[in-house]
A protein has these predicted regions:
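Phosphopantetheine-dependent thiolation modules in NRPS/PKS and related acyl-activating systems
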Residues: 1-92, 151, 155, 204-211, ...
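A hydrolase-biased, glycine/serine/histidine/acidic-enriched motif that marks catalytic-domain neighborhoods
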Residues: 78, 82-353
């Protein structure tokens, strides 16, 4: 068994066979050699693509299925090895504790159209260790029946919130389509006479007109979510089932998904996008009498007013403009800027309470 003493580089080396295998998997996926068993996945450059590769190799080598949100509860080789040694089945849940520590009031973030919470990883960390941060992933992603309306999503997520925080005031936020669900959650809380201390919308429009044809979402899977170019896999004007097969094969060759990632899993993801898009299209926001903050990019300027249309539903909306575009607003260099705006708003709301 390897020694637990730190090596020459200060990293703690693996101490048993499980840690050794996991460390090899992490190094191969991340293409980084200087990793120890106590290094945080996100600190060493981990992303959702890396996480997908790692869980795929773990599935083959250990015969265990780890959900992507494992990287928030077990963010080191050491803690992940503990899960694998325990051999217990991991519960799938909608509410993911992405940063559960801290003394401030928790902030709850709703998933985007993709259904996972990985978009919020950098924002959660940029908010600092004193800000508890929980993310909601879609029920279909978490292993149960998907919710088909925004209202149903909001009801389900409010039940989960109260397991962490039984009474208000609550702090809610959402990026893109997640902001629409957060809005409905605040409206439902008002009906329960439960206060919402903060409602934060990040580059969110109140009304959407998302395409509902399968071809659009197949193309989007190829471009955005699997990192593939349509031209590279020659998808143009081919039937959807052939496109899906080509996407899967190209993604496996590029190690963007595990080798045993099957067509059923890709089909499930496609159905999730279609269901979520239909739910957002059908929803019409209700008036909300509480205060809210809209953090928006300059990109969202195609004829919309400063509030992106939210002024029709509230008189108490503040707007904060931030650089970047819609797809990058909460990641990379933008994450600390958004986090600063969020923290400032939460502090102001707390002082004004």
């Amino acid at each position: 068994m390897a020694s637990s003493a730190a090596g020459a580089n200060g990293r703690i080396p693996p101490r048993d066979a499980v840690e050794l295998q996991l460390l090899e998997i992490w190094r191969d996926a991340l293409q980084v050699d200087d990793i120890g068993v106590t290094d945080d996945f996100f600190d060493v450059g981990g992303s959702s693509a890396h996480a997908l590769r790692i869980v795929g190799v773990i599935r083959r080598r250990f015969r265990r299925r780890l959900p992507l949100d494992t990287f928030f509860s077990a963010a080191t080789v050491e803690t992940m090895a503990g899960l694998l040694r325990a051999r217990r089945r991991l519960a799938r849940t909608c509410l993911v504790p992405m940063q559960p520590g801290g003394t401030r009031r928790p902030l709850f973030a709703v998933h985007t159209l993709g259904g996972t919470v990985m978009h919020y990883a950098e924002l959660a960390r940029a908010l600092g260790p004193d800000q508890p941060f929980y993310g909601f992933q879609a029920t279909g992603i978490a292993g149960s029946t998907p919710q088909r309306t925004v209202e149903a999503m909001a009801r389900r997520y409010l039940r989960d919130i109260r397991a962490v925080q039984p009474e208000g005031p609550y702090q809610l936020c959402g990026y893109s389509g997640g902001g629409v669900v957060a809005w409905e959650m605040a409206c439902q809380l008002a009906e329960m006479d439960q206060p919402t201390a903060a409602l934060i919308l990040i580059d969110t429009r109140p009304v959407t007109e998302l395409p509902l044809d399968t071809g659009y979402w197949v193309d989007l899977l190829a471009h955005r979510f699997l990192g593939l170019s349509r031209e590279a896999i020659e998808l143009a004007r081919r039937p959807a089932e052939i496109q899906m097969a080509a996407i899967l094969q190209a993604a496996q060759r590029g190690r963007l998904v595990p080798p045993d990632y099957g067509p059923g899993e890709l089909e499930l993801l496609l159905r999730h996008y279609l269901t979520s898009a239909a739910a957002l299209n059908a929803y019409r926001p209700r008036p909300y009498r509480g205060r809210a903050l809209l953090i928006r990019t300059d990109e969202q300027s195609d004829g919309a007013d400063e509030t992106l249309g939210w002024a029709a539903f509230t008189d108490l909306l503040r707007v904060r403009r931030i650089g970047g575009d819609h797809n990058t607003v909460i990641g990379g260099a933008q994450a600390p800027l958004v986090a600063g705006a969020v923290r400032a708003y939460l502090d102001e709301e707390r002082r004004g309470a």
